[in-house]
Amino acid sequence: MLRNTVKRLMTYTFKPSKQTSSFGPSVWLEFSPLAIKYNAVNLGQGFPNFEPPKFVKDAMIKTIEVGGFNQYTRSPGHIRLVKALSSVYSPYFGRELNAMTEIMVGVGASESLFAAISSIVNEGDEVILIEPFFDIYIGPILMAGGIPKFVTLKEEESSQAGSSDKKRSSKHWKINKEELAAAFTDKTKLIILNNPHNPVGKVYSKEELQEIADVVAKHGPNTTVISDEVYEWMTFDGEEHHRFATLPGMWERTITIGSAGKTFSITGWKVGWCIGPSNIIGAIANTHQYVPFSVPTPTQEAVAIALEQPNIKDYFKELATMYQNKRDTLLNSLTQAGLDPVIPQGTYFIMGDTSSIHLQGDQGKDTSITGMGLHLRDWNIARYLTTEYGVTTIPPSAFYCDDHQKIPENFVRFTFCKDDLTLQKAHDNLLKLKK
């Protein structure tokens, strides 16, 4: 009998859930380790490598020194933080936000998105994604049994490499509203927008957003909108960020996602939030309580103190100015290196055109990390830039569905949320492409 028991134990086989069985290593598990292996300048993953502002660090120091913030706080959000968020955001939404019912704080924008998607999508529901899309969107959709549908943001031909227009801009990347309308069916439960857009850097005009809103109103009577606006304070050259929820008839169906990590250069603090009507936020909060229950109290208290600064709007402007300067620095480097850049209107990413690079043989096919994407040009180019030129980037095909991964094959994504020394090192390495 004992022998039979041992035999049964030895034959145990683990099988992942059907909801997660299709998941494999992500693009981040390839290129961050590759950057470390080759001691490359990491312009791939979008995290700042500089310190947050002093007033933000002081807020955390004060929180720890005062004490009393070491236990669980209110599940949907620390009271001081949701009140601070209401105070900051109410003018931008053109309405008085109820701190207790219309705002929920999550473990970063990522968990906020997870809780929101999980609260909306049922098995068989369809979710429209605008390609390229941040890869984190797809996981919770599939875990909920949802079916992603894809509409592609396309660069106008007049703006592409080799055209007479010398300045390529993210504003020339457009959604075809007929294609968007055709993606809607009676099963469409959700559409996810990203504005400003990662990785293209597009900032949608109010007219473009209104076109999307019109399509949603006409073809998606029961469709909810998630508007991921974590780069809201990073717009350049006078571009204005318009919130989708402020368009006529859209507040009632829109969840707006924000991020302290992006706003204050504190991605490791993992504080994000959802803003929306109380019936939707209530459902998201119910989901949230069964995942992390609450966000760490000290980080919420510190973010609240930071948002309460009387000159916080000036800080938002300074943030945009800082990133515009860093953008211009990297644009200059890419242009000199022959990597025709798409000038971003916002975010801290730039798409660089690598058509001038011609791989030979097995160049770029380093298999020492995961060996993923060997059949895709942008993956091999990104590996080649890391291994041969010491600059790590991200292949944007990771932000497209399987059927569309050839679309961005001539691009790689660079980030400029790095200190000046890092950008200078990247500049020096990239210029070796011209030798």
UniProtKB/Swiss-Prot annotation:
It comes from Dictyostelium discoideum. Its EC number is 2.6.1.7, 4.4.1.13, 2.6.1.64. PANTHER family: FI04487P. Its cofactor is pyridoxal 5'-phosphate. Catalyzes the irreversible transamination of the L-tryptophan metabolite L-kynurenine to form kynurenic acid (KA). Metabolizes the cysteine conjugates of certain halogenated alkenes and alkanes to form reactive metabolites. Catalyzes the beta-elimination of S-conjugates and Se-conjugates of L-(seleno)cysteine, resulting in the cleavage of the C-S or C-Se bond. It holds the Pfam family Aminotran_1_2. It catalyses: L-kynurenine + 2-oxoglutarate = kynurenate + L-glutamate + H2O; 3-phenylpyruvate + L-glutamine = 2-oxoglutaramate + L-phenylalanine; an S-substituted L-cysteine + H2O = a thiol + pyruvate + NH4(+). The lineage of its organism: Eukaryota, Amoebozoa, Evosea, Eumycetozoa, Dictyostelia. Belongs to the class-I pyridoxal-phosphate-dependent aminotransferase family. Substrate binds at G46, N198, R413. GO terms for molecular function: cysteine-S-conjugate beta-lyase activity; glutamine-phenylpyruvate transaminase activity; kynurenine-oxoglutarate transaminase activity; pyridoxal phosphate binding; transaminase activity. The modification N6-(pyridoxal phosphate)lysine is found at K262. This is Kynurenine--oxoglutarate transaminase.
